[in-house]
Amino acid sequence: LLISYEEPIEPIIENQGVKRMQDFIYSQIEDCTYCVMRYRGNEAEVVIPDSQNVTVLFDRLFARHKEITSIHIPDTVTDLGELLFDGCENLRHIELPSSLTSLWGYTFCRSGFEEIVLPDKLACLPPFTFKDCKNLKRVVCGSGMKKIHAWVFGGCDQLEEVVCGPNVEISPDAYKTKALNT
């Protein structure tokens, strides 16, 4: 006997600036912008709905969601929180929005992708951004990149190439990894 149950898609419930829609809980941060505070799903392919004007993905939003293999982030997002994708070891595809201007520390820590292209508006990689990304081989920085802090690539033992402009200030400790022998 097989019994299955599918939860219906929940409508948006508003309560003092907090909304819930599908697998996401939003919090209003300004007049017309929202922060995604929680993810309660278990999908392999995650799409953050663009029906809300989301500008921030909050700290640890997808942390330890090992089931995630790809994620779509809407073009309204400007900030990615700390430890956002920590432990998403099966994450293979992520396309960052061109609107992205800010990352917090450890954003992609222990994620599973092999390559990432950073948007032009992103000017800085904070410490430990890609810490222990064991599969990471290639990073392409956008034209607006100005600073790569210490330990950004710490523990990225498969890292082969980081492409960035000639005027980027790079910490001497940014590439502490076996792959680049530094």
Please place each PLM-identified region on the residue numbering.
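Short, Lys/Arg-enriched N-terminal segments with co-localized hydrophobic residues
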Residues: 1-20
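Structural signature of tandem-repeat unit edges
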Residues: 5, 21-32, 40-56, 66-79, ...
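Consensus positions within tandem repeat domains that build extended binding/scaffold surfaces
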Residues: 36, 60-61, 82-84, 104-107, ...
